[in-house]
């Protein structure tokens, strides 16, 4: 999906993807940013890519490639929260779309998407819902658009624990 070498762009039809940089999170994220737990992101690589096509403006893409979450497996909630912190920092004030995808696009992706959505809902639902209730609510909502999201009980538990942690820190 992306080139491995900055000197060899990847071409697919009219599209060209060029690698600008590829760095581990601890080199890409500033160490003085208190909102990002860099130590939790040793399995995260951050790539800067540019997508171009003839007669079109180039699109800059920042890819976060996290290899520390096994397929169908749960993840300690602290890692999901650290990933979300890194995403927030790298997005800054931009309103560009956030794309999330794992191998099948539903288990790990769905868990992260639901955590992201729950974070947006927290100010409204903070005192009326438990972490598990919000996890069930966001999962049911996301499954309308991405069937099978949050594939395993372990992923649901991870999601509920991450949401509960967000509630406690709000």
Across the structure, where does each feature detected by a protein language model lie?
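Cysteine-based protein phosphatase catalytic domain of the PTP/DSP
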Residues: 1-170
